């Protein structure tokens, strides 16, 4: 018999345990991501951030429900690989991904919000880029996205260091000429950001 989790008289069937407190669940044929929190302030932070992100143009999974008594949130489950997995398979991402990430950064800067733009925090469903963590960070005046996080979206020294810190192996010989990479990044920024 499959494990079930009941929230506000709604029953969710556990399909897969994804982490210590995270589950892929199903209800009435729809797949969701369910997360249990240890502390009330963690859930409150999730609720606050989901509301802040909802008013931006940033794509996030739809929040289905949350329960403050059981310390649980339920959001739409986004299928597929995250952008880091796509990058590790192939150096060239769909141009729509670059267009989306630059637009997302512009919207966040305009709203005076900061998010973690690391590629493993995003999924691409073929049409749009979706931010998964529901986490915002303190806004930093003068923060340079292009010199920090955007470099993680290309085969650079920063990308190599980042993926190795996550426990992935990466062949440093795949890192291209830094001048050519910087030029590609600048052209993307001019095309989609300016």
Regions found by a protein language model. Give the residues of each.
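Catalytic-loop of the protein kinase fold
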Residues: 112-119
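Conserved structural core of kinase catalytic domains
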Residues: 61-99
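Structural motif at the C-terminus of the N-lobe alphaC helix and the adjacent alphaC-beta4 loop
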Residues: 49-59
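Protein kinase catalytic-loop region centered on the HRD/HxD motif
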Residues: 105-112
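C-lobe/activation-segment region of protein kinase-like
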Residues: 112, 125-194
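Protein kinase-like catalytic core scaffold
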Residues: 32, 59, 73, 130-132
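ATP-binding glycine-rich loop module of kinase domains
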Residues: 8-47
């Amino acid at each position: 018999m499959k494990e079930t989790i009941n929230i506000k008289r709604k029953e969710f069937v556990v399909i897969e345990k994804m982490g210590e407190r995270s589950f892929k669940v199903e209800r009435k044929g729809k797949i969701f991501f369910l997360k249990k929190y240890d502390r009330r302030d963690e859930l409150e932070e999730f609720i606050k951030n989901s509301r802040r992100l909802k008013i931006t143009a940033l794509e996030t999974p739809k929040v289905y429900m949350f329960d403050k008594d059981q310390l649980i949130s339920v959001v739409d489950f986004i299928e597929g690989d995250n952008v880091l997995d796509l990058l590790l398979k192939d150096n060239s991402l769909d141009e729509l991904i670059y267009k989306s990430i630059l637009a997302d950064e512009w919207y966040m800067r305009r709203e005076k919000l900061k998010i973690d733009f690391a590629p493993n925090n995003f999924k691409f469903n073929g049409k749009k880029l979706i931010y998964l963590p529901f986490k915002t960070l303190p806004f930093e005046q003068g923060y340079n996205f292009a010199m920090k996080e955007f470099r993680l979206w290309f085969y650079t020294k920063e990308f190599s260091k980042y993926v190795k810190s996550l426990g992935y192996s990466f062949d440093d010989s795949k890192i291209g000429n830094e001048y050519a990479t910087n030029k590609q990044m600048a052209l993307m920024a001019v095309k989609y950001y300016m």
